[in-house]
Amino acid sequence: MIRKKRMSKGIAKILSGFLVFGMVAGLVPAAPDQTVHAKAADVSKPGVTVYATKEQLMTAFTPDASGTNANVGKLLFGINASDTAQGWYILGKDNGVQGDNTIIFAASPIATGKFNNEQKNKAYMKDYGTYTDGDSAEECAANHYGASNLRVTLQGMASNKDYFSDAEQTLMQATTVATTDTKAKKDYTTTDKLYALEGVRDAIILKAGSDNSVQLQRSVYWSEDEFWLRSPYESSYLGSYDYAANCTSTEEQKVKDKYVDETKAIRPATNLNLSNVLFASAVSVKSGKIEEAMTLRLDGKNKGIGTATYNVLKKEIKVNRGDTADTVNLIVQYKSGGQETLYGCPIERSQDVKLPYEDVDLSKCKIWLETTSDGLIYAVEATEENGGTPAEEHTGSHLIDLPQGATWTGINSLDNDLSAGYYYLTDNVNLTETWTPQDGVVLCLNG
C-alpha cells in the first residue's frame, strides 16, 4: 500500500454536519472532556507540473517569446540507451500537426552518435529531403541533415522496441521540418517521428516544432549537454565548412560548430498524439512517490479496469474492479498544506476504500484507477456519487429529532462560553488551538 502524507498544523475548515466523522446518522454531544482539534485541512488540487490535463499538456508548458515558461513540465516516455526511462520537456501543441498533440524534447541524451560517419559529400537521393523550390540538388555536403547518419539513427530509434514499445510508437507522430542546404543555398523539408532541433551559430535559443515556432532558452532547457542540431554551419567562405554542423557547447553556453564525424549527445524532439490521453501525473506506483516527471494516463475504459465513485460527505471511494488480469491500483492525488501528496493501494476485488486521513476533501482530489500495458498506463477517472448533501449545507437538523422546544442555532465562531444547546456553524472557522465545549453543548460538524 502506498501512503504518502505530509501533515502541517494550520487552518481547520469546520462545516456543519455530523459530530462524529463517518457516522451515517445520529449526533453525539460534545462533552467537557472531549476536544475538537485543529486539523491540517488545507487541501487543494495538485500542481500542474505533477498533474496536467490533456488541455494543459497542450497549453500550460509552451515557452513564451523569450524561450521560457514559469511552468517547466517533464514527461517520461520511452527508454534511453542507458536502459532507463527517458525524460522529455513538454513544449505544448504544434499547430502544424493535426489534432490534439504536444511537442516533447529530450531533457537528457537518449543516446550518442556522429552527425555523419565521414567528412564526405553524397550524391543526392530523394529520401534526403524535398526542396521547397520543387527542384533537387546534385550533391549533398557532409553537413546535410537529410542525408546524415544522425537522421538515420533517429529513424531507427523511432521504430526500435529497445527505445519505444509498440504502443508508444503509435503515439509518436511525424513532424515536417525545414532545414537549409548551404551547398545548394536553398531549403528542404524532412518528415520524421524523431528530429533534431534547429540552432544557428552563436545562438542561445534553439527552435522546435514544424515551423520553428517554439523557442527554447539555453538556461532553462539545454545548458548541460553538447548535442547535435540539424543546422549546418553557415560560413561566408564557400566550401570551407561543408564538413561542420552545429551543436550546443557547454563551455561557451551557446551554439557552436563541430566536424560531422565527432561524437556528441543526441537529444531529439517528437510529437505525441493526445487524442486518447486523459491526463498526465507524476505519481509512480513503482516507487510509491510523486516523481519529478509525469507519465501519460490513457483512456482505459476498454481495458477491463473497472469503475470508481467517491462520496464527499462520507469520505469514501467505492471501487468496482473489472475483469483484467493485470494489476489495478487506486490512486488519490492532491496537495495538502502546500505539499504534493498521494494515497494509493492495489485493488484485487470490488471494495469500499476510506483514506486514513479524515481531513481530505475528496472533491479537490484527483482520483482514478490505473493499470499498465506495453509500457503505457491506462486509467479510469472516478466520478462523484450521485445524491448526498453539499458540503456547505447544514444537515443535522434535517436528520435528527430534537427534544421538544429545542432548536438549532447558527453560530459563526467557537466561544467557550456557549450555553447548553444545539449549534451549527454558519461559516468556516480558523482553529489555532483545541476547543473544549461546555456541558450540554451539541455542535454539528460535517466530517
Where are these regions (language model features)?
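Sec-dependent N-terminal signal peptides of Gram-positive bacterial secreted proteins and lipoproteins
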Residues: G10-P32
